[in-house]
């Protein structure tokens, strides 16, 4: 009887431990997923191509980014590391996501060329690591970096506050204040410095 009781206690303890360790329940795209706890997580410091959710055409390599994210984390336990700002304006948890082997998913997506860096102050703990990984992917011309822009502009306007850059005709670019306004001669130069393309004008 005592042996059965001890076995039952051990089983309950193991089940409790398993339930307490969060795993990835669903992957939405290249930089967003949901945990078994119900929390939605947005990866810090990266911006993956957008998947078509509104009837528009999905961005280049958007589905490939989601597939890699799913391959890395779907159904697996992960460790989350937070930064200074805990949630975004949508209420999603902002995190660096680590696999059991210690690899950071945010960095792996950038290194494979399936996400761009997007610094978001004050969450800048790993910004240098992510930018170094992006520069390597750019130099190797893999993923998003394998092709040049279809309609290049003479210059691009960057915002040093949001780390987004825009076409000269973009209203968002025109409204950037002088102290945050940065000019780039090419998309490549802007991305090399860690700026990410505007979602509206899509440079």
Q: Which residue ranges define each predicted feature?
A:
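Small beta-barrel nucleic-acid-binding modules, primarily SNase/OB-fold domains
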Residues: 2, 7-8, 13-203
């Amino acid at each position: 009887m005592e042996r059965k009781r001890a076995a039952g206690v051990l089983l309950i303890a193991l089940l409790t431990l398993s339930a307490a360790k969060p795993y990835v329940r669903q992957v939405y795209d290249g930089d967003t997923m949901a945990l078994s706890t119900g929390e939605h997580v947005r990866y810090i410091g990266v911006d993956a191509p957008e998947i078509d959710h509104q009837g528009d055409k999905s961005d280049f390599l958007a589905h490939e980014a989601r597939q890699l994210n799913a391959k890395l984390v779907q159904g697996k336990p992960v460790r989350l590391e937070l930064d200074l700002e805990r949630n975004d304006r949508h209420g999603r948890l902002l995190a660096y996501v680590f696999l059991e082997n210690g690899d950071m998913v945010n960095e792996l997506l950038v290194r494979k060329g399936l996400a761009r860096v997007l610094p978001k102050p004050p969450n800048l703990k790993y910004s240098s690591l992510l930018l170094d990984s992006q520069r390597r992917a750019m130099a190797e011309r893999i993923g998003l970096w394998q092709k040049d822009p279809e309609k290049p502009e003479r210059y691009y306007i960057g915002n040093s506050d949001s780390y987004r850059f825009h076409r000269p005709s973009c209203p968002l670019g025109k409204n950037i204040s002088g102290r945050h306004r940065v000019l780039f001669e090419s998309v490549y130069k802007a991305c090399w410095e860690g700026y990410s393309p505007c979602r509206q004008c899509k440079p």
